[in-house]
């Protein structure tokens, strides 16, 4: 009998193309960048030992964030720069040495996201231009040295012009807006005092309510983008360690700060009815280092740099410089 022919192996299956367009990641990158753009904590406004009653502050902040979306199918790299300006409108001292402060603030910022999808040669870019208006209120138990308890709150409204464009595609534009409100408290304890300097440690807790609304959008090709509106709660637990002079307020004050961020920003959108989310982890851990000091009698400057990391290859690098002018 004729032997059976050897079986021919099946050819290797062709790799499946990515289920996602890179534009999907650009939309999600814009969504996250807008919500993060104007978020801040009390120390970002330049608090320091023996601050004067009235002051105006300016903060320039830049950050670079790398993250995934759609369970790792999308890769996003976002760069954001913001400028925030604020001024005290009212300062009221208490009979026990404390102080209340009330001020207003405004901000402007822009971000750019580059998005790629697994198995897709093309790229997409997302851009956000943002603007904010808000107010803040602060109480210090010890206004002169800022020892003991403090409480800070702020609220702001922001609006954004967004755009997304894939390689060779028509640019898509849409608008969004957001509201945020923050409550923060902490306690500054001095220790290790020498004849001229002392150490301070300051545990901090902050809770932020975040509301983000994005208008529905139909792309030129007919794709429907919806569902980018929701609210969320975020928290930050941290501790700040610094070393400062107790005899000369003009010397430099170095500091280091460790933070644990918990909670997610609004993180999903619907693309032709299919919901896609970013992969930002629930818990993120960060470290910031910086220094503050006087540049002139009524001018204080500061600078800081830091990084946050988390699961799903999440990384965030940031740097900021600020100036406060007292009157």
Regions picked out by a protein language model, each given a short descriptive name:
Residues 13-23, 50-327:
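Membrane translocator/pore-forming domains, dominated by Gram-negative outer-membrane beta-barrels
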